[in-house]
């Protein structure tokens, strides 16, 4: 009986789809496919039963009509509807996997149609394209955004290079490509426009934009490696992900950021759900007053960091409290501004070139300063060592000095001995001796000698003489 009902339901439901991975029905609302969170599908079941009930009046045989009416009444119970809805999930043409939705990364679904981003061609909404998201803006090729352009001029301080960088960055975020393999930090003290910038773009992009907690990309010991990452799973299909500002002193989860920006398939799962794979198409953007700590010094993480400075503080008397509403009225023009940026990005990345973002001295300088500030080994070596031709320092002595220096400077994160040695080798040659390894042409500075002796109860017994090899300076009993 349930199978017969589900087949009858299939005729009504042929315009609906079932997602077996997320265990939800997908319904077409005339512009996009949406999760059936309002139980529309059960309403369709009631409509089908109403039609069957009406059909009874056209049946001449009383017994047949009575049997059908009794069958309809039984089917109205919640248990019966759940049963034939479950059967309908498997009917031909109804099941559809998540990866079958939103497959064309070069389209942007808008309120007045589907926009081909490369050609700027608008076509009517089409259920056969299986698009599940929609930006909250109309495409109007003649629309302009003078207030927005003045705002960009203000927040960049008239830096034309930085203004163009922002335009191309936003244009790149419209499409589903992650070719740049990077994340963006909008950095600066308050009252500089970065929040207004992101909020305006979030309004424009609608479903294509999602907000994530700062913990999503923060490294934390409390998170187990096998924990359900529903915070990552929910980002599937988004193109623009804004991150809440993290706590001061938070550490970036470098491995996860590499995964999320690398363009490769990642695995996630909703809590209590099955694991699934997806290829990210979102770009991560965080507006912050304080940057996260980055322990890694490898190219793999730093080539992914884009630090966009927002350094123009807007005095309170010049702040326009109506600016958000004015910018919202210009969303069609802002879309055209972003599309111009996308055209520049596409032109710059032709011929297989990975990077389409333009050169920007302000961004490059900010990243360089950030990297230098985060290189704690370089800071330790600058504090505690100095070049000294002919002198050496035992590797174990230098590592002990480093640990003491970390304690002195409240450095919560400390490198293991092996990793520490690999980092120091980038600055000094290491030589293997008969009894121990030693760094060549290095001497401990006065600060280094002080740190070396910390916790021993005594001061160094030998002054840091520059004329003798350092292994003689530092030969102290462990």
Q: What residue spans do the PLM features occupy?
A:
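Structured alpha/beta reader/binder surfaces that contact nucleic acids or chromatin modification marks
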Residues: 44, 49, 404
